[in-house]
Amino acid sequence: MNPRRKKRLTLAVALIGGVAAIASLLLYALNSNLNLFYTPSEIVNGKTDTGVKPEAGQRIRVGGMVTVGSMVRDPNSLHVQFAVHDSLGGEILVTYDDLLPDLFREGQGIVAQGVLGEDGKLAATEVLAKHDENYMPPEVAEAMGQKHEKLDYSQQKSATQ
């Protein structure tokens, strides 16, 4: 192999190696910032289609309804703990160390983003409350709508009369 061809080959291999290293670092950075959405049932039982459960230490988003009577506030700090449930019966505890949104209340739909702990609790870094009676995050609406059955009040009322 002549020196010119050897130099080109070395340059090509170095260029391909550099591109591969940059792509690897980029994918690693994207993977660590990836937030997957789960319902409480999916955290407890795994995703319905794949059975995959989130791992401890993973950043996730959880959506559902705040369980009535589950909120516990620390009187000496901003620390609050509450449970979030969904229509499938799954429930997860969420801890949060900041001011809750003004519209946050028990029985309200929320989305919490944070890190799943070894104990199964979500250490939330952000809590979003729904802002009016018609709004629900698309992921929560889809998950809750799978088991939601619409009632026809006109038929129900005529049956009782």
Swiss-Prot record:
Residues 138-161 are annotated as: Disordered. The chain crosses the membrane at residues 9-29. Signal peptide: none annotated. One of its GO terms (molecular function) is metal ion binding. It is found in: Cell inner membrane. One of its GO terms (cellular component) is plasma membrane. It holds the Pfam family CcmE. Residues 1-8 are cytoplasmic. GO terms for biological process: cytochrome complex assembly. The keyword Iron applies. Keywords: Cell inner membrane, Cell membrane, Cytochrome c-type biogenesis, Heme, Iron, Membrane, Metal-binding, Signal-anchor, Transmembrane, Transmembrane helix. Heme binds at residues 131, 135. It is a single-pass type II membrane protein. Residues 30-161 are periplasmic. Heme chaperone required for the biogenesis of c-type cytochromes. Transiently binds heme delivered by CcmC and transfers the heme to apo-cytochromes in a process facilitated by CcmF and CcmH. Belongs to the CcmE/CycJ family. This is Cytochrome c-type biogenesis protein CcmE.
